[in-house]
Curated annotation (Swiss-Prot):
This is Taste receptor type 2 member 60. It is a multi-pass membrane protein. Glycans are attached at residue 179. Residues 29-40, 110-128, 205-234, 286-318 are cytoplasmic. It is found in: Membrane. The chain crosses the membrane at residues 8-28, 41-61, 89-109, 129-149, 184-204, 235-255, 265-285. Disulfide bonds: none annotated. Belongs to the G-protein coupled receptor T2R family. Keywords: G-protein coupled receptor, Glycoprotein, Membrane, Receptor, Sensory transduction, Taste, Transducer, Transmembrane, Transmembrane helix. Residues 1-7, 62-88, 150-183, 256-264 are extracellular. It holds the Pfam family TAS2R. The gene is TAS2R60. It comes from Gorilla gorilla gorilla (Western lowland gorilla).
Length: 318
């Protein structure tokens, strides 16, 4: 089953697990609030100016997918916690998994395209292909967004087919969730259909993301070394700008890596579902998810300006 480790079968009664689930829900609320602010801030600018820069349009798309994804995941967490013995392919969880599969794939692709955009626009490479992409990439943005939605929809349908077939097999054979025959059929489908599909779906955008991030961080590192030779140190405004950009990129990369690892660990069954280690790992992942929107708010000049205007309006200053 896809989506926040939806294989069930044991109840969560441990007090530590309950505390971690509570922390997890709070972190998700923070992530929802942060992404919601990003959507609202850039959405207002879009309405006022009737346009958005390509980078901002990608940020809105990423923020919207994360906002919806966190909301769906929160619903799944509550459902799993309240119904730990529910069959993992019942209609409710299939509906939630359908949303999760689409939003998860869209989030991965939007994050990847944002890294591509940063790499092409910021990195200082002189290769002809790289320079050609600098001029063409912004015009491709609508097609990039549509292709991301299309790929996400296609893989979501493939996931739904596998999930629905297992549920139909369960109904035909009147199997119980803990039935040995039912579990063997489910394990076969998960191992030879869902798992390869997951790896292909998640690895493609991740590979592109890593390549772009390595190129971009390498370019910024070289530029910082050159700047150090011509400036008085790290207190120079230009150097501080490079450091902030590098830290923002590293935080983005850490979030993406941690999220990708959580997906792989889930698919491989490294952390048993509803086990204490499972909730610890989830808390770490969503701590990153909650922190990254905050980093974006302070690293993006437009978002930072909106945040300052909100503070000044609260204080009653012009």
């Amino acid at each position: 089953m896809n989506g926040d480790h939806m294989v069930l079968g044991s109840s969560v009664t441990d007090k530590k697990a309950i505390i971690l689930v509570t922390i997890l829900l709070l972190l998700r609320l923070v992530a929802i609030a942060g992404n919601g602010f990003i959507i609202a801030a850039l959405g207002v600018e879009w309405v006022l100016r009737r346009m958005l820069l390509p980078c901002d349009x990608l940020l809105v798309s990423l923020g919207a997918s994360r906002f919806c994804l966190q909301s769906v995941v929160m619903g799944k967490t509550i459902y799993v916690f309240l119904h730990p013995m529910a069959f993992p392919y019942n209609p409710v969880l299939q509906f939630l998994a359908f949303q999760w599969d689409f939003l998860n794939a869209a989030t991965l692709w939007f994050s990847t395209w944002l890294s591509v955009f940063y790499c092409v626009k910021i990195a200082a490479f002189t290769h002809p292909v790289f320079l050609w992409l600098k001029h063409k990439l912004s015009g491709w943005l609508p097609w990039i967004l549509f292709s991301s939605v299309g790929l996400s929809s296609f893989t979501t349908i493939l996931f739904f087919i596998g999930n629905h077939r297992m549920y139909q097999n369960y109904l035909r054979n009147h199997l119980q969730p803990w039935n040995i025959t039912g579990n063997s059929i489910r394990s076969y489908c998960e191992k030879f259909y869902l798992f390869p599909l997951k790896m292909i779906t998640w690895t493609m955008p991740t590979a592109v993301f890593f390549i772009c991030m390595i190129l971009l961080i390498t370019s910024l590192g070289r530029h910082m070394k050159k700047a150090l030779l011509t400036t008085s140190g790290f207190r120079e405004p230009s150097m501080q700008a490079h450091i902030k950009a590098l830290l923002a990129l590293l935080s983005f990369a850490m979030l993406f890596i941690s999220y990708f690892l959580s997906l792989v660990f889930s698919a491989a069954g490294i952390f048993p579902p509803l086990d204490f280690k499972f909730w610890v790992w989830e808390s770490v992942i969503y701590l990153c998810a909650a922190v990254h929107p905050i980093i974006l708010l302070f690293s993006n000049c437009r978002l930072r300006a909106v945040l300052k205007s909100c503070r000044s309006s609260r204080c009653g200053t012009p």
